[in-house]
Amino acid sequence: MLEPLNEGLLSRISDVLLCGWTCQHCCQRCYESSCCQSSEDEVEILGPFPAQTPPWLMASRSNDKDGDSVHTASDVPLTPRTNSPDGRRSSSDTSKSTYSLTRRISSLDSRRPSSPLIDIKPVEFGVLSAKKESIQPSVLRRTYTPDDYFRKFEPRLYSLDSNLDDVDSLTDEEIMSKYQLGMLHFSTQYDLLHNHLTVRVIEARDLPPPISHDGSRQDMAHSNPYVKICLLPDQKNSKQTGVKRKTQKPVFEERYTFEIPFLEAQRRTLLLTVVDFDKFSRHCVIGKVAVPLCEVDLVKGGHWWKALIPSSQNEVELGELLLSLNYLPSAGRLNVDIIRAKQLLQTDVSQGSDPFVKIQLVHGLKLVKTKKTSFLRGTIDPFYNESFSFKVPQEELENASLVFTVFGHNMKSSNDFIGRIVIGQYSSGPSESNHWRRMLNTHRTAVEQWHSLRSRAECDRVSPASLEVT
């Protein structure tokens, strides 16, 4: 009889041995079952190329090298698995397991993707051999030289004024004898301290007398010259001398200042245009003088007598008008501000101009309302700053037009027409149409814009509203 203590100890030992054998036997069978065996098709390697060896595979290789248990497929015989009578695995079973693991490792190594190889064959251009036949028969063509192309080029077709192509090569005496338009005396001086250019128009001589309307005789009564000055390419900010009556040898002695940096002034061209003011035929260009300022010493200054050459610009600018438009939808009011005008044409030889602006509201083709500013005496650059308001319901706004006409006040006869623009439904040009569109898109906000005045004939041609007013 064993002691109860000894019986308890033996039972515990037997339980441990039985549990260990059961776990080993069951786990081995589970491992060898099909559910735990991965086929070659189930192996998937993800990641960037080239693929890296998994950590578990590297650990298996290191263990196999330490124990010299790695065999090739030719070293291990393919024998069926048998179990010993006591249920333990035989040596053939161990070899089969080793072979199975080795084959899976070899399969993974063989299927590891490598960097893709692109078989690039050289692209053959041109003829590979002289034996190949040409697709099209060869045609003998004439080889053109650059002279052949430039021989067909005619510069006169691209010149703004074909008659002035040889002016640069002529002296002032030759220009004078060729065109006989007279000569102009002027000077320039740049002030580095105040950054402005001063142009002095002194006098002109030998100007041609105007011809009467029928062309039969010279009309000395209408020889009233004046000079316009600008710095190209900017023709908007121009200056203008006074008109000298009934003379071909006018003396001006007038100075004009242009606020412009020195480097910018060197890139400009001084343009002086001599214009004859005819009371009946209006303003006729006699000739011009163009001086690139990069060719003169601006700081030192200088005086020049230059012969006038013909100008391709037969008509002078009529002037510009600065307007402001504002519409209030809730009140149904169209507000107009006449701010200022500049470089208006002179309408009176002795007094200059007394300009004023007439504003006329046209609904459709019907004149509704007329208003006008006060006239300012003896100026071609008037400042008005006058406001006007027209009652225009919102539903009628799209059919409304505003006609702005600048006149020179004349107490002895009818007022002298200077220029006109139309803004609204029947605008007289793209600038006027753009101003109207901007006002419609920004209600309750004043919209300012400069406009170049147009002739009466031009406005009547493009705007029906211009025909309805006087």
UniProtKB/Swiss-Prot annotation:
Keywords: Differentiation, Membrane, Phosphoprotein, Repeat. It is found in: Membrane. The modification Phosphoserine is found at S114, S115. Residues 92-112 have a biased composition (Low complexity). Residues 180-306, 317-451 form the C2 domain. The keyword Ligase does not apply. Gene3D superfamilies: C2 domain. It is a peripheral membrane protein. Belongs to the synaptotagmin family. This is Synaptotagmin-17. The gene is Syt17.
